[in-house]
Every structure is written in structure tokens, then in C-alpha cells.
Amino acid sequence: MKINEFIQKYRTVTKLVPGMTSSHTPHVVCNDGFEMSVQAGQSLYSEPREVVDSYEEAEVGFPSTEESLLTSYAENEDNLCGTVYGYVPCTIIDEVIEKHGGIDESKIDIK
């Protein structure tokens, strides 16, 4: 499963006021146990910065272990597991997912 498919399947969107939304996607959990937050939408480090069906770039946050494919996007390179990674190309996110064995949908925490 690619990240855009994951976002479409699991994201929840809440309309706050006309023209403003809040969106949340549960953590991506990979088959080898690697986890990361991947978010896209208004007020997030994504492209586009709207609620759409497909993204070019998304915000990654708080990976469970350091991931070399993400390092150059880190806001804080001194705390790679406790920072946000802005505007990460979805192709890179897909590479990270593939590197870690794909998404384990049985472990997705749907609230």
C-alpha cells in the first residue's frame, strides 16, 4: 500500500468552520515494527496544503527509529525520533514503507 492510498483509507477530516478543516491519519505501522506519523492537509507541512485525494509531499513525524531516507527533511537533526520532517516527497515515504516490509494494516490504531 502506498502512502496516498493509506491517507485516503484511514484519514478522518473534521470541518472546523467554513473553509477550514482538521485532518488526522493514524500512525503508519510497518511489518518490521517501524512506526511513523504521516499527515497531510491544511496547516500541515504537505503539498498541497488542502484535503485532497493525492499528495506530492507530506509531513512525517516521530519515527520509532532513525531512518536515513528521512534525515535530510528533519526539523531537528539532533533528535531524529522526536522531530517533524516537513514536505517529504511521497515517493520517499513509499520507499521508507517498502524498506520496512510494507504497512501492517492489522496494527493500525483506528479511533
Spans of features found by a protein language model:
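Compositionally biased, intrinsically disordered low-complexity regions enriched in proline and serine
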Residues: I7, R11, S46, E56, ...
